[in-house]
């Protein structure tokens, strides 16, 4: 997203490299390993991805995914391309791979055909330690012999009090072993997996990605209508199943328990970015963003805390339990712009710029002090800072 503004070749190389390790069934792993890179957890030997008949032979990957922003990123590169012909050639090559990625999600992760896909691990949400997952993960009462051996690397570089607890990592590791023991066969995983969640952020970004893939299809002379229809189906399903009228926000749904997860987090306002709510619901969401525990209109707070600051598990510096994340602010900013909430979007834009210039490119920031925490050279923070700094909004070519 950042390279697109000044290094088109680098931007296309980054995306292409990831898709070079796409699985045969369309799964796009969240990690492609460099075997020359030093110690990392979870590393190559932890995943046992090779047990899947769909995993690539020529590279080593993880066995889980991340939110499907890739079609959106490809369109982002095209809209900022200095060499438009090269950009069209690039997304011509990527178009079938993007299609296979989305088809995998709807085929394997939406078995009832609702239009909503599920995630099967907290890591797949991108919000590993969110309090959304607490009630789901607490159902996993593990015996010592059920916990795979592992050694955390994160707490050697970041304060332990800012990171997930060891008990959470035990459950993260157990789920990976659960997948590997079933050879990453989605049907077998689905039969007994204790973590199957229809996540708001993931589905909102998938809906937006299908909208953007439809735009790419049109630019390539392909029929965009099936993609547009699928995006509308996802938006409709989110509005029917995930909307919380009382609180003016969308909620994740726990498939194993058959109920919504009543935890209020800023990422669950991201449906604005995909134009999922109607104008009335969008107004409710903006009110939630301004007046509830997210405090967009509160000048004493650095917006937007990732979790309701009045919530039971709020902690201003602990991973996804309160800190401000630039990527969530960026998504909310763009969503607010889509609905014409320019003043609120401007506050988020100014926050992104001031956090990065005053503190640096940190992984996340304390909403009560504005201080940076986590990694101090975090790539998506830098990338989105560049996007915000270099232009206020994308062109629509």
Set out the residue ranges of the language-model regions.
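Extended glycan-interaction surfaces of carbohydrate-active proteins
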Residues: 15-60, 115-200, 236-324, 357-397
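Well-ordered alpha-helical scaffold segments within catalytic/enzyme domains
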Residues: 1-9, 69-86, 204-222, 270-280, ...
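Internal, well-ordered domain-core segments that constitute the primary functional module
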Residues: 66-137
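Short amphipathic alpha-helical segments
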Residues: 327-331, 344-351, 356, 360, ...
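Alpha-helix boundary/capping segments in eukaryotic regulatory proteins
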Residues: 5-13, 29, 57-66, 79-92
């Amino acid at each position: 997203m950042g390279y697109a503004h000044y290094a088109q070749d680098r931007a296309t190389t980054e995306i292409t490299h990831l898709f070079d390790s796409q699985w045969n069934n369309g799964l796009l792993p969240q990690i492609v390993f460099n075997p020359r890179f030093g110690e990392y957890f979870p590393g190559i030997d932890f995943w046992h991805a090779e047990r899947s008949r769909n995993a690539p032979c020529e590279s080593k990957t993880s066995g889980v995914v991340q939110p499907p922003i890739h079609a959106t990123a490809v369109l982002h590169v095209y809209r900022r391309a200095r060499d438009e012909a090269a950009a069209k050639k690039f997304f011509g090559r990527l178009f079938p791979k993007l299609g296979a990625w989305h088809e995998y999600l709807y085929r394997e992760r939406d078995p009832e055909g609702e239009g909503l896909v599920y995630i099967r691990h907290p890591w797949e949400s991108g919000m590993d330690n969110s309090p959304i997952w607490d009630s789901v993960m607490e159902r996993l009462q593990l015996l010592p012999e059920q916990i795979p051996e592992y050694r955390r690397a994160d707490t050697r570089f970041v304060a332990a009090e800012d990171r997930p607890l060891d008990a959470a990592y035990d459950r993260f590791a157990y789920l990976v072993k659960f997948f590997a023991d079933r050879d990453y066969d989605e049907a077998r995983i689905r039969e007994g997996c204790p973590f199957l969640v229809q996540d708001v952020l993931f589905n909102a970004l998938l809906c937006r990605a299908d909208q953007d893939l439809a735009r790419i299809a049109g630019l390539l002379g392909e029929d965009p209508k099936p993609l547009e229809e699928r995006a509308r189906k996802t938006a409709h399903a989110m509005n029917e199943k995930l909307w919380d009228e009382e609180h003016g926000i969308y909620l994740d749904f726990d498939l194993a328990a058959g109920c919504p997860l009543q935890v209020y987090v800023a990422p669950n306002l991201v449906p604005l970015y995909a134009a999922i709510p109607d104008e009335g619901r969008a107004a409710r969401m903006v009110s939630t963003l301004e007046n509830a525990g997210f405090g967009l209109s509160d000048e004493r707070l650095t917006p937007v805390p990732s979790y309701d600051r009045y919530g039971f598990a709020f902690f201003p510096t602990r991973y996804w339990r309160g800190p401000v994340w630039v990527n969530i602010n960026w998504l909310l900013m763009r969503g607010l712009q889509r609905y014409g909430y320019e003043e609120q979007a401007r506050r988020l834009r100014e926050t992104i710029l001031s956090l990065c210039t005053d503190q640096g490119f940190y992984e996340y920031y304390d909403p009560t002090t504005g201080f940076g925490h986590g990694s101090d050279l975090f790539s998506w923070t830098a990338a989105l800072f560049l996007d915000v700094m270099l232009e206020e909004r994308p062109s629509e070519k």
